[in-house]
């Protein structure tokens, strides 16, 4: 069976050290590695001068130093047949990539991990949210939408993804524990950019 190629297009900054690539977001390590189990995967991201802690175990990674090189990498994939495009979040880089893909009638998936409305409001201020909203409306109207939370998409036809990094060994040989005293406390990322709900 021929494995289909999936091109992941992300705003993620990636550090290159010889043949190794590192990113700062564990999701952007897990996603391409997980998809590569069943598909051929190419990952297009932005270059970084800072080495981050998550090594991405993937052979086909393209790192762009500017928007023109980024879009060049997207256009270069058009020579390949039977391909799908997987945009991660809505940013200017992924939006311009989307426009090119849409013009050439490519199959596009958009994966929304957080509310861009809230992030843009926090980072750039309330006045700039309308720019994000226009990009959001254009992309979700013309893509297959996948979300981590139903509130992230107003589109009725979206696919809810339940990310879990717990695999089978976590669920084997469970022991009864005493809940009288807390022995482990984990607090995930809580920040205004991602929204606190």
Each predicted region: which residue ranges?
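N-terminal subdomain of nucleotide-sugar transferases
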Residues: 1-51
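Active-site proximal beta-strand in glycosyltransferases
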Residues: 2-11, 101-118, 146, 158-162
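Conserved donor-binding/catalytic core segment of Leloir-type glycosyltransferases
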Residues: 7, 177-194
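Acceptor-binding helix/loop patch of EC 2.4 sugar-transfer enzymes
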Residues: 9-19, 109-135, 154, 169, ...
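Short internal beta-strands
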Residues: 42-46, 111-112, 148
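A short, charged, and often flexible helix/loop element on the N-terminal side
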Residues: 48-76, 87, 124
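An aromatic- and histidine-rich active-site surface loop
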Residues: 85-117, 150-153
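Donor nucleotide-sugar binding/catalytic pocket of nucleotide-sugar-dependent glycosyltransferases
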Residues: 125-183
């Amino acid at each position: 069976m021929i494995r289909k190629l999936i091109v992941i297009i992300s705003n993620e900054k990636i550090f290159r050290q010889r043949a190794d690539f590192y990113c700062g977001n564990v999701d952007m390590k897990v996603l391409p590695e997980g998809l590569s189990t069943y598909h051929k995967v190419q990952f297009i991201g932005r270059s970084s001068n800072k080495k981050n802690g998550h090594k991405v175990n993937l052979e086909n990674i393209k790192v762009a130093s500017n928007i023109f090189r980024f879009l060049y990498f997207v256009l270069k994939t058009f020579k390949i047949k039977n391909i799908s495009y997987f945009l991660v979040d809505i940013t200017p880089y992924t939006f311009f990539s989307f426009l090119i893909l849409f013009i050439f009638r490519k199959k596009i998936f958009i994966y929304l991990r957080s509310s861009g409305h809230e992030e843009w409001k926090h980072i750039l201020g309330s006045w700039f949210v309308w720019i994000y909203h226009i990009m959001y409306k254009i992309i979700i109207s013309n893509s297959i939408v996948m979300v981590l939370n139903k509130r992230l998409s107003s589109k009725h036809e979206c696919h809810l993804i339940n990310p879990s990094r717990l695999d089978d060994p976590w669920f084997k040989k469970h022991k009864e524990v005493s809940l009288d005293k807390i022995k482990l406390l984990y607090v995930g990322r809580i920040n205004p950019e991602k929204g606190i709900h």
